[in-house]
């Protein structure tokens, strides 16, 4: 009898252990993040007309491989800035507005489960991004993009995905610095909340309402950095550290590779990862969640940056989107004129140049302004002598900026230029010094790099001036006259042509430089184009048929006995070739 009781007890104990074991389950979730793809959908650069690295065509091969391993537990997410960059995006933004947008079509085909808005997506304007969002088979998020009419998010703030009983909440946010760069008409009816308080609010709601096992931040904002006025441009790392609840923060926007674990204020580990840009790498995150009786008992997060250039171009993908490839290729292959000489942005750093002065000339003609501001937007862009094609316009003018005319006093014009040249040029103490302001140290045998962003190196046209590089910052500029020889006055108000990025405060040249408050910038705008500058460039070239670009020589660096030889040396350091 005792023997039977012991056997029964043993069987009961074994059954309980088996039941407990059956109640415990380990689930592996794979997250793949693309960010800042910038229209790099095909392994071909439609601007430079050559084969290219990265691309969604390679990402498709990687995603397909991972889905064979993880099935539906493989989650593809896109973190924004997909609608601007290559002509592939431009064509479906503005030329073919009837077909499904190729960015939506491709991500739908690849099985993307969630997307996020980026600042360059906003820059395309409501007509483009509203259409694209509707065509996506997945939600495009934006918790901190607020509809002024309702006070609620304009887009879905978060998405909850359930895989094998594991609930994954994804909270999407964008850098709130949009108004510092973009005209209000592109984001009319909206405003952008700071990321950290927005994250606190929605993490609390998500935890209370959704009972998630994992919380993922999908943030189109970089690691840390710029504070524009009272707005923090890149707050992803701040949110990861200061707002408890996140297991993973997927970053973007700053085009910088990152993969690191940080500890938040609650003492928990958070993976922070950023795949930079152009789909050369993707964020590859592995979540392992163990649940017992419906509760998480163990959770681990590992991440790496997966190199897409180790993967083949997907033939399946290329065949599927062959019609779109052909449409874009036909678009960029259209001849619009002829140019009588080769022009390059490389000359623009060392003085008046045909490349930049062509844009100055166009801005002045379109706007009727007295003065023009313009910077090289591509580091080493070049348009070769001969036929000009639509593709060349993306080299000549990289971004979809509008043209503004603003009212600035003579003193504000000078102060604007003082800041531009202060971040551009070194203060030379001898003829052996660098003319350019480089990152230190400049190592022998290696290329030099600018200390600051070259897209903020604005020169002017419409005025004659010199830049004395022996003087300290704030004292370099001497404006001698208007370009027609009439006097220039510090007190007079002038009409100044410049792009919308600059006119909205981008680069701080108008605010920190000219001393105009952010709030007053909009009041200074007296004219704005309906279309981007590239559109008007194309129109201008088609009308002219043959371009004869030349440097206007309205400004120069002095003293020339120092600056001319220094320019030759610095050109060699920057580009690895002699200045012609």
Regions found by a protein language model. Name each.
Residues 21-310, 350-362, 372-374, 528:
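Acidic, metal/ion-coordinating pockets
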Residues 24-30, 34, 39-49, 53-65, ...:
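Catalytic centers of hydrolytic enzymes
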Residues 1-25:
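Bacterial Sec-dependent N-terminal signal peptides
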Residues 4, 171, 501-503:
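A composition-driven signal for long, intrinsically disordered, charge-rich low-complexity tracts
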Residues 12-14, 20, 58, 77, ...:
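Generic detector of low-complexity/intrinsically disordered segments
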